[in-house]
Amino acid sequence: MALQCVLGAGRTGKTDYIYQQMIKESMENRDENFFFLVPDQSTLNAQRELITRHPNHGTMNIDVVGFYRLSYRVFEELSYIPKELLNDEGKSMVIRKVMGECRKDLLVFGSGMEKQGFIDEMKSFFAETYQYDVSLEKLKEAVKSFENTDSLTLKMKDIVLVLEKFEDYMKDRYLVSEQLLDVLAQKITESEKLKGATIYIDGFTGFTPIQNKVLKKLLPYAKKIVAAFTIDEKRAGGPYRDYELFAMPKKEISQLKEMAVRQGVPIQIGRAHV
């Protein structure tokens, strides 16, 4: 187990380094599993680039995946069948249904649910709570800390009520796509393919909390994780401020380092040498 952060400004060879090292190591260790983790929308381009660069013009023992595709790889390996995924239209229908059922208990949103775009806004909020690993219990605790009765507090109480009804309805029936990564995090240590695998990561500016939850589980379980970040090595150290230019990569490097240290995973940080 090891963590390597590859740093460098834009167009300084980080991606070239990732491809070169990944191909080299995969050819030297043909019996080992390699994963190339990229944003979900970039998997096709990454596969094409890998095939072009590989001497054998094939991905061989390298699996190009996004976080969601990685979920399905693990589920398939374990013969695990997750609950049926609810699409966007289905989410809207369920939200509208549960809001209708608890409409009389809503403090603010009861009269607004028929407005154009309202259900979509609620759906987006729910998606973000799952992506950022904000549970219903955390929201309830936050609302309890509000002591006033202003508009924001009343809206938050409505949101908590609707989310609770939404999750009650979904339980034992469906999953939303944003919940898949939480299931993946729970299943990682059951996967033989991920055990001792080498994972290369490129194309991300940062990770959501639920993605970090997956990476935290992978760090001690994989043989090595190599992640590229667009930031000069000199800028990567020290504290960061949310509004500074390179806040996202600095924050992510800091979080990965903290997760690695807490789990006794060795860390190497430096620029790419192509």
What do these predicted ranges mean?
Residues 195-207:
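Conserved P-loop NTPase "ATPase switch" module shared by AAA+ and STAND
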Residues 36-38, 64, 200, 224-229:
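Structural recognition of the conserved hydrophobic beta-strand(s) that form the central parallel beta-sheet
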Residues 211-271:
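Conserved RecA-like helicase ATPase core segment
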Residues 18, 42-43, 51-193, 260-270:
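Basic/charged alpha-beta structural segments of nucleotide/phosphate-handling enzymes
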Residues 17-28:
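Walker A/P-loop NTP-binding motif
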Residues 2-18:
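Walker A/P-loop
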Residues 18, 31-43, 227:
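Conserved RecA-like ASCE P-loop NTPase motor core of nucleic-acid helicases/translocases
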